[in-house]
Amino acid sequence: EQWLFDGFIFLESQDVDRPDSGAYSYMTGVLRDAGVSAGKEQWQELIDYYFTKGNCADALEQAVKEATARLGKAPCKRRVIIMIPDPIIHRHYIDTTTTTTYWGELGGRRLDFNSNEDRVAACRWYIDQVRARFAQGDYKYIDLAGFYWIREIAAQPHDTEYSYHLTRSDIMLPHIADYLHKLDYTFSWIPYYGSRGYDVWQQFGFDQVYLQPNYYWKPQNDMDEV
């Protein structure tokens, strides 16, 4: 046995396996025909899930601890990257007649996701909550290295065929990146092959970007293209 992976990512695109039969989306583009955008309550539930004893962070901590007993101390702590939910503008992402004030309150004020500043504020709140919970865990074998942007496309105003008006991520991402960098965290992204924005990833503030080859979805593709 030898040490191999030194980084792990926690992410969820949707929450549909719920006792209340609800269906919530953490990113624009999923649950098109059913379900609604996740609000503050669901974002908090996601954080709670990641840090519940026996789940995600704790499970990885225990796994590395067990491996350390067999292999000796790893060269460094295993790094954890945690996703940031997409602050979807509308309650139902594709229906622009649905409310933009569904998410919840911060500082005694109901946020309006039609506002870029409010969407960034929600992401900053989430980042701070994750940081606090990770610190409370007092982990010996894992380290919070950064955050991951879950939405795999970053359309710009000229990308009209990609429903730019439903996301406007290009306006928001640099502000999230600035906040993370001030806290000394990395900002990662994994766009799919042919995604919009992948070629200008630096202007969004990402540090690490990995392009998906899409072979999983299109196995008929020529391997030269992949």
Where do the protein language model's features map onto the residues?
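Glycan-processing catalytic domains of CAZymes
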Residues: 1-226
